[in-house]
Amino acid sequence: MIRTVTGYIEKNSALGKTTPPLQREGMIVERLKYVIWAADMDRAVEFYCRVFGGTVLRQNQVISEVSVANGVIGIHGGGEGTRTWTGLNFQVPDVIAGAAEIVAAGGLLLREPQPEDNEPPHLAMCADPDGNEIMLTRRRTH
């Protein structure tokens, strides 16, 4: 599927430019972040803000987001204070559809999206064709 980047059209039309719109293939990605785990959420958020000059975008005991240099670090609560997996996370509107696109493009589905807390699925674990793990998430309501 090819999508036109409409913001590009609106911006350039306002400037009087007639450049054709950008087109790209692929799923809609709402946010890209790198996710880590923390045993102590407050300590982790304070660390990334103090050491790297981060700005808190969202914070609770389940998931917090800290912006650093136009990137986002997702800090997931429930870590055990030891080295754990971290990973590239694409926030998409629909993890089931996103996982299907990854599989159709030669990737793998490592963990089926499951409903949780009376909400639609919010997580799919996938891998690219080279085996690199990718998380697809949907923004949760809480």
Mark where each language-model region is.
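Conserved short beta-strand elements that form part of the metal-binding/catalytic scaffold
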Residues: 8, 12, 16, 55-86, ...
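Vicinal oxygen chelate
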Residues: 40, 89-133
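N-terminal beta-strand motif that seeds the catalytic metal site of vicinal oxygen chelate
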Residues: 7-45, 72, 86-88, 138-142
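Short secondary-structure junctions
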Residues: 53-59, 108-113
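Terminal peptide-recognition signature
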Residues: 48
